[in-house]
Amino acid sequence: MKTSIQQLVAVLLNRQVANWVVLYVKLHNFHWNVNGPNFFTLHEKFEELYTEASGHIDTLAERVLSIGGSPIATLAASLEEASIKEATGGESAAEMVSSVVNDFVDLVGELKVARDVADEADDEATADMLDAIEAGLEKHVWMLEAFLE
């Protein structure tokens, strides 16, 4: 029987599954709809990021399963659970990049909370996985902010 702290780990991981599903679609939206002088750079970057998002979805969902949970697996459930919001459409290239930066910063904060809960549950594998995702996001934030300067 799982303790309440172990159940909370699964809930927090599922939030991240949902966030990455929404972000995956958002990044595709930006990839398809970016325009302007930075088209080639951003078109490629958004593809890199949605490919990475796909890997995070799978890794997070499989971790939920491995700790006895059930991963969110529908778009409707993802939209309901996610803290990340869909793109509204019509964003400029700079607004797209700013939106991704803001989403990544928010995710870093949520990942830190989830990692602390995983640490409390003595779930080192989950904590390590979350640390790795966080480190990647922090690097992306740095690079994308440099692009916006």
Curated annotation (Swiss-Prot):
The subcellular localization recorded is: Cytoplasm, Nucleoid
- Kindly list the GO CC terms recorded for this protein: cytoplasm; nucleoid
Q: Which reaction does it catalyse?
A: 2 Fe(2+) + H2O2 + 2 H(+) = 2 Fe(3+) + 2 H2O
Q: Kindly list the positions annotated as binding Fe cation 1.
A: H31, D58, E62
Query: Where does it primarily localize?
Result: cytoplasm
| EC primary class | oxidoreductase
A GO biological-process term: intracellular iron ion homeostasis
Q: What is its EC number?
A: 1.16.-.-
Provide the binding site for Fe cation 2: E62
Q: Which keywords belong to this entry? A: Cytoplasm, DNA condensation, DNA-binding, Iron, Iron storage, Metal-binding, Oxidoreductase
Q: Which GO terms describe its molecular function?
A: DNA binding; ferric iron binding; oxidoreductase activity, acting on metal ions
Share what the entry says about its subunit structure, partners included. The 12 subunits form a hollow sphere into which the mineral iron core of up to 500 Fe(3+) can be deposited. Homododecamer.
Quote the record's domain comment. 12 di-nuclear ferroxidase centers are located at the interfaces between subunits related by 2-fold symmetry axes.
What does this protein do, in the record's words? During stationary phase, binds the chromosome non-specifically, forming a highly ordered and stable dps-DNA co-crystal within which chromosomal DNA is condensed and protected from diverse damages. It protects DNA from oxidative damage by sequestering intracellular Fe(2+) ion and storing it in the form of Fe(3+) oxyhydroxide mineral. One hydrogen peroxide oxidizes two Fe(2+) ions, which prevents hydroxyl radical production by the Fenton reaction.
Q: Which family does it belong to?
A: Belongs to the Dps family.
**Which protein are we looking at?**
DNA protection during starvation protein
List the source organism. Brevibacillus brevis (Bacillus brevis)
Q: Which gene encodes it?
A: dps
